[in-house]
């Protein structure tokens, strides 16, 4: 059987992009694939505004697949529907030169540093957790003047590494 990786939301009924759906050789690592037929994706770079990553921003979905609104919740609808058929996903992403969509974070999880740069903590936390010495990592700077990183060490791995280095644990 075939298995496809894709991206979509309930509000976009649900497919926006998928890897491999348009035939062999149409999958690309680190992306969720090509945008589906009849759907258009644009990237709102004003939502991110990071000079180091100017091609990233909020993923905006355009198409007949976009919901009309949230049932009995006009306020929430106004926050995400720009105009009929145009939806703010709340996800950060980028399109490469061939039209493959990559998801890079969430708009609401980002925060601004004192130097004006925006940070999406999830990729940094995931990189820290690649170390066998780190059990969990949380990066936060929302509503703060400083950014804080809390690391929960993997004590078993830490003791083994110290022993291998000749340090008495």
Q: How does the language model describe each region?
A:
Residues 10, 118, 132-136, 157-169:
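Conserved C-terminal helical docking segment of ANL/AMP-forming enzymes
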């Amino acid at each position: 059987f075939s298995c496809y990786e894709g991206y979509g939301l309930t509000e976009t009924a649900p497919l926006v992009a998928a890897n491999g759906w348009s035939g062999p050789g149409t999958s690309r690592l680190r992306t969720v694939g090509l945008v589906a037929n009849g759907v258009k994706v644009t990237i709102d770079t004003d939502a991110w505004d990071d000079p180091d990553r100017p091609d990233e921003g909020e993923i905006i979905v355009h198409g007949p697949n976009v919901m009309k609104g949230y049932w009995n919740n006009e306020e929430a609808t106004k926050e995400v529907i720009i105009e009929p058929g145009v939806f703010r996903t709340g996800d950060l992403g980028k399109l490469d030169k061939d039209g493959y969509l990559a998801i890079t974070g969430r708009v609401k999880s980002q925060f601004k540093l004192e130097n004006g740069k925006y940070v999406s903590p999830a990729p940094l936390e995931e990189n820290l957790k690649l170390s066998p010495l780190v059990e969990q990592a949380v990066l936060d700077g929302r509503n703060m003047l400083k950014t804080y990183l809390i690391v929960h060490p993997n004590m078993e791995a830490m003791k083994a590494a110290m022993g291998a280095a000749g340090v008495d644990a």
